Design a protein with these regions (language model features):
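Acidic helix-start/capping segments at beta-turn-to-alpha-helix junctions
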Residues: 12-15, 57-72, 78-82
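A short glycine/serine-rich beta->alpha loop
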Residues: 26-32, 105-109
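Active-site SXXK
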Residues: 31-53, 64, 262
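Short alpha-helical patches at coil-to-helix transitions and adjacent helical residues
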Residues: 37-40, 66, 70, 112-120
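Amphipathic coiled-coil signal-relay and dimerization helices
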Residues: 19-27
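A mature extracytoplasmic/lumenal domain signature
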Residues: 13-15, 36-38, 48, 68, ...
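Penicillin-recognizing serine hydrolase domain
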Residues: 1-8, 14, 21, 78-293
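Acidic/His-rich structured neighborhood in mature extracellular/periplasmic domains
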Residues: 35, 58, 102-104
Length: 293
């Protein structure tokens, strides 16, 4: 990893040994702010708290999980008691590295703290212990993750761009500014191909940094363009992991019969660009997968 970049990963092979084992790991218990990865926990909590799902809520779950919709996440977060949902999920699933946002930031679901180890544990819970309707609903949506988020940001980085199908993914990003340098188009993403050329766009989820963006540099072609959320710049020392640094995460399942469970979490230098961060995490994910084969 380049200087100033922090990475953590866990890869669990469900076919290794008798009942599966971790086959690649680094900084497994290091805490990161979750960004949109926390939406999986929101979905688990919601589905396990009721036996029927009204059509309107089914639409919220679909758009939140497939297209990382922030308004849907905020609706479910508020209904579930904000940080209380994280406390419930951490206890129920045995997530020792997971904690809700600070009490001073109750609405910021993206400021939840979690680790690569705990993310893998959540996926294993869905695969092995969750009720079939919970498992099938959540993983069904993650298998159908859209190239573009509802806000126009490209979410095909890491696993979708580095690994062949089949896969199921939930991505997370925060601290890169609010306006994408290039608006995502459904036909522009190339799943299964590592790309280090022109960059897809990136975003700050509304739940993790709702304030305006601070940009440096110019928007001219070929010029260096960097942006970081104003909230992140002001919030150093707040107790939220890596505030002041952009984070980019790729998590999910890969391979036939969901053989591999992966979580790759990264924090990048303050002011770092989306394109450079995407190249780093996608290259890292491709290298991890190559070493498994």
């Amino acid at each position: 990893m380049p200087a100033g970049t922090t990475a953590a990963w866990v890869v669990f092979d469900r076919q290794a040994g008798g009942g599966g084992r971790i086959v690649a790991t680094r900084n497994a218990h290091r805490a990161f702010r979750s960004a949109s990865v926390v939406k999986i926990l929101l979905a688990v909590d919601y589905l396990e708290s009721r036996t029927t799902v009204p059509p309107a809520d089914a639409r919220l779950l679909k758009i939140m999980l497939r297209s990382s919709d922030d308004d849907a996440a905020s609706t479910l977060w508020d209904r579930a008691g904000k940080g209380a949902v994280i406390t419930r999920m951490a206890r129920r699933l045995g997530l020792s590295d997971t904690a809700p946002p600070p009490a001073s930031k109750p609405g910021f679901w993206g400021y939840t703290s979690l680790s690569a180890y705990d993310v893998v544990r959540v996926y294993r819970y869905l695969l092995d212990r969750a009720a079939p309707r919970v498992r099938d609903t959540i993983l069904g949506h993650l298998r159908a993750a859209t190239p573009c988020g509802t806000d126009g940001f490209d979410q095909y980085f890491g696993i979708p761009r580095a690994l062949p199908r089949p896969w199921a993914v939930k991505q997370g990003w925060s601290g890169f500014g609010e306006v994408p340098p290039v608006r995502c188009r459904p036909g522009s993403a190339s799943p299964g191909v590592v790309s280090t050329g022109s960059a897809p766009a990136g975003a700050v989820p509304a739940g993790s940094a709702p304030a305006g963006a601070v940009s440096t540099g110019t928007g001219a072609t070929g010029a260096r363009r960097a942006s970081i959320s104003a909230v992140a710049l002001r919030a150093r020392g707040s107790g939220v992991p890596d505030l002041g640094r952009p984070v980019l995460h790729t998590t999910g399942l890969a391979g036939k019969d969901d053989r591999y469970v992966l979580a790759v979490l990264t924090a990048h230098p303050a002011g770092g660009t989306w394109s450079a961060s995407v190249r780093r995490i996608t290259t890292l994910t491709a290298e991890l997968y190559r070493d498994l084969r």
